[in-house]
Amino acid sequence: MTSLSAKDKDVVKAFWAKISSKATDIGADALGRMLVVYPQTKTYFAHWKDLSPGSAPVKKHGQTVMGGVAEAVGKIDNLTAGLLNLSELHAFTLRVDPANFKILSHNILVVLAIMFPNDFTPEVHVAMDKFLAALALALAEKYR
């Protein structure tokens, strides 16, 4: 995996500062897309009455997901240690297949490109892709 350079980290932090006010919308859209495009991911949310994009549970969990992304931006210099509790939660309690972190990361990138077309430059795209890959790896840490 490619590590985040100092420049990547600066780009991620600057982009996050621009988009963080829309984090709830980003998370809801990304999660809704994931559930439609990758229907196998619905198994983790079978207890929800409505799995459709824009539903209350999807919006709420999208907000939760993006809260985790915000936490990761704040701990960008040591994601593995900084996200240890989230890694343990997903590995031991929720038992989420870590492959799903990559799927959701992809959907977050899609939504960022749609919602922020002028700010989502190739440089931002690369930095955010590397950041989300590093985040997915940090979340998968306790699966080893």
UniProtKB/Swiss-Prot annotation:
GO cellular component annotations of the record: haptoglobin-hemoglobin complex; hemoglobin complex
Binding site for O2: H61
Alphabetized Pfam families for the sequence: Globin
Keywords annotated in UniProt: Heme, Iron, Metal-binding, Oxygen transport, Transport
PROSITE patterns: GLOBIN
Protein name: Hemoglobin embryonic subunit alpha
GO molecular function terms attached to this record: heme binding; metal ion binding; oxygen binding; oxygen carrier activity
Domain named Globin: residues: 3-144
Source organism per UniProt: Oryzias latipes
Biological process per Gene Ontology, one example term: hydrogen peroxide catabolic process
Task performed by this protein: Involved in oxygen transport from gills to the various peripheral tissues.
